[in-house]
């Protein structure tokens, strides 16, 4: 299965009538493996900051998580594995695998829990597969 099919079929899937607004799988170096249409154009330093938070959990909390210039307030995640952010009625979940970052961005009516499930479950699978 191609990475684009993974984004289209697994990350943008329908959950109780809701789905992610944007999704992407990117390398930990910031290279895009696959992304949804109109995924925010992120800056290399934003990915560097995300990777730094995985290596030093809590480093994003004072400044916020930026993705495509949008600031998200960092909320409780799983240190070294998952970063979660909130902005108004929506938010973002970033799951780290061995080689990639899986990113899901959502808005209401999707819930944070639905976003977490959609992003983290495939992430766990990719970890099991060596990615």
UniProtKB/Swiss-Prot annotation:
Pfam families: Profilin (PF00235). It is found in: Cytoplasm, Cytoskeleton. Its main location: cytoplasm. The keyword Membrane does not apply. InterPro entries: PFN (IPR048278), PFN_euk (IPR005455), PFN_sf (IPR036140), Profilin_CS (IPR027310). CDD domains: PROF (cd00148). SUPFAM superfamilies: Profilin (actin-binding protein) (SSF55770). Keywords: Actin-binding, Allergen, Cytoplasm, Cytoskeleton. GO terms for cellular component: cell cortex; cytoskeleton. It comes from the Eukaryota. GO terms for molecular function: actin monomer binding. Binds to actin and affects the structure of the cytoskeleton. At high concentrations, profilin prevents the polymerization of actin, whereas it enhances it at low concentrations. By binding to PIP2, it inhibits the formation of IP3 and DG. Belongs to the profilin family. PANTHER family: PROFILIN, PROFILIN-1. Occurs in many kinds of cells as a complex with monomeric actin in a 1:1 ratio. This is Profilin-1. It comes from Glycine max (Soybean).
């Amino acid at each position: 299965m191609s990475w684009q099919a993974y984004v289209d079929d697994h990350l943008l899937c329908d959950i109780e009538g809701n789905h992610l607004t944007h999704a992407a799988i990117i390398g930990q170096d910031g290279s895009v493996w696959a992304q949804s249409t109109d995924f925010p154009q992120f800056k290399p330093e934003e990915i560097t900051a995300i990777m730094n938070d995985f290596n030093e959990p809590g480093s994003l909390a004072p400044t916020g998580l930026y993705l495509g210039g949008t600031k998200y307030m960092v909320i409780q995640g799983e240190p070294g594995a998952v970063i979660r952010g909130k902005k108004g009625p929506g938010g973002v979940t970033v799951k780290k695998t061995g080689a990639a970052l899986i990113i899901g961005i959502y808005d209401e009516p999707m819930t944070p829990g639905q976003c977490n499930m959609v992003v983290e479950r495939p992430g766990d699978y990719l970890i099991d597969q060596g990615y």
